[in-house]
Amino acid sequence: MSRMAEQQLYIHGGYTSATSGRTFETINPANGNVLATVQAAGREDVDRAVKSAQQGQKIWAAMTAMERSRILRRAVDILRERNDELAKLETLDTGKAYSETSTVDIVTGADVLEYYAGLIPALEGSQIPLRETSFVYTRREPLGVVAGIGAWNYPIQIALWKSAPALAAGNAMIFKPSEVTPLTALKLAEIYSEAGLPDGVFNVLPGVGAETGQYLTDHPGIAKVSFTGGVASGKKVMANSAASSLKEVTMELGGKSPLIVFDDADLDLAADIAMMANFFSSGQVCTNGTRVFVPTKCKAAFEQKVLARVERIRAGDVFDPQTNFGPLVSFPHRDNVLRYIAKGKEEGARVLCGGNVLKGDSFDNGAWVAPTVFTDCSDDMTIVREEIFGPVMSILTYESEDEVIRRANDTDYGLAAGIVTADLNRAHRVIHQLEAGICWINTWGESPAEIPVGGYKHSGIGRENGVMTLQSYTQVKSIQVEMAKFQSIF
């Protein structure tokens, strides 16, 4: 693909040049080619976007629920019509296999938008009787202008997960995509405008997180920030948001999730789940189950089943429909994952497979890392304690149910957890004791629109998706009505 034209900001229904004068490049991680130069939003651009959003939000919030619903449904239709086109762009920008982006990324994002478009008319207040002459009613009102700050692993899906409930509740959103993968968020802005969204209701500001992101979290005109990313960055976003104007926040942060295989489990099923929980999207999924606990007596058999499945991974041309494994999103991220792999070897974990970059004509110019499985791991190893965000599985053994529950919970993270067992009683008993916000029994990874997604502990604050997320983009106003004569004590 030839280099794209320089990408601008999207403010008030159209493209506009950044006033900062700064740019950055976005690359295709499969081959290292530059896709485009992208303009970076500065402080003045954030001010412009906030002013635009304030104007557009008043128009948007004044529309009826059905009017807003119809516009968002039109956007859903356009997304589905352009699924393949958007998936190709997402593959170029992220390196993910087209077989994945064409069936997951845009599809699941559109599903969430459709879900919230349908919920808009159901956003209701309540009526509370006090006595014969007085009652209270409540209204759910939009917050105003909110900001979304996205991660690089699911660019358009995250943009939709954040914008769908925000817009459905009557807010305007300023979205900052990751500087690593900024392209499809700009296309989403075009689609929203084409669907009839008033100018300013969805503005997109590409830029570096430490600058553009901080300007957004500092800005007094923004009522809430929804952030997806790492824990360290999330803490900074939360601190800035609170220090500037006590903004509300939603944080979807990192994870080091446990997958527990019990001794009665079907090991073929367990191996299939472990593969999806570690190597889907080349391991760049926040909910990945990278700590795989297996009974000591099942370890050898489980390892062989995993190795057999690793052999079936197909890396290569990301547009080949048979390819199911792509490069990592960038060269700096590849190097970071390789440092973790080296640390695992240094600390005594045994490499079952991988542990290196992929080599050959298809791989030499890209950010490729081989699917890697470590075994003989212990809880104190760096690869077991810290989020790697790459195709690296760690296998650990255990002896008892109580032991594995304790060890599974021995982490600062609490995003996801899963178990594989044939015993339904044990399934629920154990899941109820695991400290994680998203849990799976005999499956892994599905996050449909109806399910609240978020973590315990350092893995986040608040939830995305589900009814409660729509409500989190509103503020409740209570109004008392008195029909009797008011009595003053003065």
UniProtKB/Swiss-Prot annotation:
Pathway: Amine and polyamine biosynthesis; betaine biosynthesis via choline pathway; betaine from betaine aldehyde: step 1/1. NAD(+) binds at residues 150-152, 176-179, 230-233, 254, 286, 387. It catalyses: betaine aldehyde + NAD(+) + H2O = glycine betaine + NADH + 2 H(+). Keywords: Metal-binding, NAD, NADP, Oxidation, Oxidoreductase, Potassium. It is an enzyme of class 1 (oxidoreductase). SUPFAM superfamilies: ALDH-like. The keyword Oxidoreductase applies. Binds 2 potassium ions per subunit. The active site is at 162 (charge relay system), 252 (proton acceptor), 286 (nucleophile), 464 (charge relay system). Its cofactor is K(+). K(+) 1 binds at residues 26-27, 93, 180. One of its GO terms (biological process) is glycine betaine biosynthetic process from choline. The record marks 248 as: Seems to be a necessary countercharge to the potassium cations. The modification Cysteine sulfenic acid (-SOH) is found at residue 286. GO terms for molecular function: betaine-aldehyde dehydrogenase (NAD+) activity; metal ion binding. Dimer of dimers. NCBIfam families: BADH (TIGR01804), PRK13252.1 (NF009725). Belongs to the aldehyde dehydrogenase family. Involved in the biosynthesis of the osmoprotectant glycine betaine. Catalyzes the irreversible oxidation of betaine aldehyde to the corresponding acid. This is Betaine aldehyde dehydrogenase. It comes from Escherichia coli O6:H1 (strain CFT073 / ATCC 700928 / UPEC). The gene is betB.
